[in-house]
Curated annotation (Swiss-Prot):
It comes from Mycoplasma mobile (strain ATCC 43663 / 163K / NCTC 11711) (Mesomycoplasma mobile). The gene is ecfA2. It is a peripheral membrane protein. It is found in: Cell membrane. Signal peptide: none annotated. This is Energy-coupling factor transporter ATP-binding protein EcfA2. Belongs to the ABC transporter superfamily. Energy-coupling factor EcfA family.
Length: 308
């Protein structure tokens, strides 16, 4: 699946005293299998943007072209998947393939645990697939499969989701999206409110899904997470995309991040301090990378002393 965003703008309450332009001439493309972080200060347009990717919102100007395999609607009894494209744009007509788009592009919003509502975890996970026309039998099979993938025991299926901790509820919400088998997975602040261990476990799940070919997009203020896990970073500010590139290249510019109200990754701040003192390290994306680089630097320094 591919998504191409063509010069979209979004205006809320147009021609009114409270008119507000949330997105301004945004053009981006997304390929299957990418792992992307979307960053930017509060109110920069990040959440509004991701709402456009599966037609929860439509642009005021511009369009979004989604290319992939969609069910052929001509034969509703025995639909087959065919290569086609869907164009999302401002229209009064009903958007074709809307269910297919939302099946293939799943979004988990911040504090998704508050979206749980069924009496059991099994029913909550199965709700999405059933609403898309999947049989109950198949939906419950998927619930059993995906609760394990998100790291919860199978015997939780008959429990009420409201008995769980915040982190566990978020895993159930994630399982519900995965049960619809999307190609694109989009998460809005997925680690907000989680402790370090919970954050690590959620990010490891995302990494595994990406390694299996899923496109993973995370909206995050935590640039340490973006640095360690994602390969591409898109930077929003005031409704514009101000940077789009390899994650390390975008986040390494510590001064640029601060100028745009973002706290740089701690590792790269420390790396820059060392660099200013003449200690040059290669690219570091994690604590493990940093420790390895420091050890290598010290070994090289000690060998140089011995030779002298």
């Amino acid at each position: 699946m591919q998504i191409e965003v063509k010069n979209i703008s979004k205006v809320f309450e147009p021609k009114s005293p409270i008119e507000f332009t949330a997105l301004k001439g945004v053009s981006l493309s997304f390929e299957q299998g990418e792992f992307i972080s979307i960053i930017g200060p509060t109110g920069s347009g990040k959440t509004t943007f991701i709402e456009h990717l599966n037609a929860l919102n439509l642009p005021s100007i511009g369009s979004i072209v989604i290319k992939g395999k969609f069910k052929d609607q001509k034969d509703k009894k025995n639909p087959v998947l065919i290569e086609s494209e869907v164009i999302l744009q401002k229209t009064k007509r009903k958007i074709k393939q809307i269910k297919e788009i939302r099946r293939q592009i799943g979004i988990v919003f911040q504090f998704a645990e508050y979206q749980l509502f069924e009496s059991t975890i099994e029913k909550d996970i199965a709700f999405g697939p059933i609403s898309l026309g999947i049989s109950k039998e198949e939906a419950y099979k998927r619930a059993k499969k995906y609760i394990s993938i998100v790291g919860l025991p199978e015997n939780y299926l008959q429990r009420s989701p409201f008995e769980l901790s915040g982190g566990q509820k978020r895993r159930v919400a994630l399982a519900g999206i995965l049960a619809m088998d999307p190609d694109f997975l989009i998460f809005d602040e997925p680690t907000a409110g989680l402790d370090p261990q919970g954050s690590k476990e959620i990010l490891e799940i995302f990494g595994k899904l990406n390694s299996e070919g899923k496109t993973v997009i995370i909206v995050t203020h935590n640039l340490d997470h973006a640095l360690e896990w994602t390969n591409r970073t898109i930077f929003f500010n005031d409704g514009f995309v101000i940077k789009d590139g390899k994650t390390y290249d975008v986040l390494e510019d510590v001064d640029f991040l601060r100028e745009n109200e973002m706290e740089p990754p701690k590792l790269l701040v420390l790396k820059k301090l060392l660099q200013d003192k003449g200690i040059n390290l290669s690219k570091v994306r994690s604590i493990e990378d940093f420790a390895r680089e420091i050890n290598q630097y010290l070994e090289t320094k000690n060998k140089t002393k011995e030779n002298n």
